[in-house]
């Protein structure tokens, strides 16, 4: 098993519902360590840069508008197979299709307000973690 890091974002809808602690408990109960964390209210420029891969997609403007609608909590998670483990915890993008007991099934309202973001691959995770955390601010433990 490989020790990996992945980026996780608790989105504005979940922050507003005050379920940050419940989501963190799920990470830790699954064996993921939080190795960096911060709350931030993204600027439009930062949200557009972070989601630039989706710039040509029809949902891009709505995604950016949503991500700047309130603060988010960003964390780097570390553990065995962290990327897949985190994606399994999140559940399907559409909370109506997410398995019971996943973060999105339990806390998300819609495909847009779907509570969490997670890296989809090791390469993406490295870029996304670097976007929010200079390497000096990520601490293995």
Curated annotation (Swiss-Prot):
Top-level taxon of the source organism: Bacteria
HAMAP family for this protein: NDP_kinase
Protein name (record): Nucleoside diphosphate kinase
GO terms classed as biological process: CTP biosynthetic process; GTP biosynthetic process; UTP biosynthetic process
Record-annotated active site: 117 (pros-phosphohistidine intermediate)
NCBIfam families membership: PRK00668.1
One of the record's GO cellular component terms: cytoplasm
InterPro entries xrefs: NDK-like_dom, NDK-like_dom_sf, Nucleoside_diP_kinase
Gene name as annotated: ndk
Assembly and interaction partners: Homotetramer.
Family to which this protein belongs: Belongs to the NDK family.
This enzyme's EC code(s): 2.7.4.6
Gene Ontology terms, MF aspect: ATP binding; metal ion binding; nucleoside diphosphate kinase activity
Reactions catalysed: a 2'-deoxyribonucleoside 5'-diphosphate + ATP = a 2'-deoxyribonucleoside 5'-triphosphate + ADP; a ribonucleoside 5'-diphosphate + ATP = a ribonucleoside 5'-triphosphate + ADP
Subcellular compartments: Cytoplasm
Function: Major role in the synthesis of nucleoside triphosphates other than ATP. The ATP gamma phosphate is transferred to the NDP beta phosphate via a ping-pong mechanism, using a phosphorylated active-site intermediate.
Cofactor(s) of this protein: Mg(2+)
EC primary class: transferase
Lineage: Bacteria, Pseudomonadati, Pseudomonadota, Betaproteobacteria, Burkholderiales
Binding site for ATP: 11, 59, 87, 93, 104, 114
Keywords noted in UniProt: ATP-binding, Cytoplasm, Kinase, Magnesium, Metal-binding, Nucleotide metabolism, Nucleotide-binding, Phosphoprotein, Transferase
A Pfam family assignment: NDK
